[in-house]
C-alpha cells in the first residue's frame, strides 16, 4: 500500500520571485527616501537663513542700506547660527547664505550653499532664493519658482 506524502512549503521559484519583488520595491523606495532626507536637511538651512531675515529688514529700515555682515545686522557670528546639517549662516551685503556642513549633511549637499537675496521696496523686503550650489530638485518649492 502506497501512501501519498503531501509536500508543503514554498518552492525555490516562489521564494526567488518574492525576493525579486522585494528588490524591485527597494530599488524604487531607497532613492525616494534619500531625496526626502536631503530635502529635510535643506529645509533646516532654509529655516535658519529665514530666521535672519528680520534682522536684515530692521537694519535696512534704520539705515537705508543692506547690512555688510552678521555683526552689523545685530546677529551672532556666522558659525554660531548652525544646526545639525548647517555649519553657518552668514549675512553678506544683505544676502543670507546658509552653508551646509561638510561632515553631517548628505554627500549631495555637503559644503553647498543656499542663498536668500533681498529686494527692498519702500515698505518691505521680498526674499528670493538665488541660484545656489544646491541642486534644484532638493530646494523647497518657494525656491524653484
Go through each PLM region and give its residues.
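Short, conserved catalytic or interaction motifs in soluble domains
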Residues: 3, 27-30, 35, 54
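Generic leucine side-chain signal with a strong bias for well-ordered alpha-helical environments
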Residues: 12-15, 25, 48, 116
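Conserved hydrophobic/amphipathic alpha-helical signal-anchor segments
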Residues: 35-73
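Internal alpha-helical transmembrane segments of multi-pass membrane proteins, especially GPCRs
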Residues: 14-17, 38
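Alpha-helical hydrophobic helix detector
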Residues: 16-31
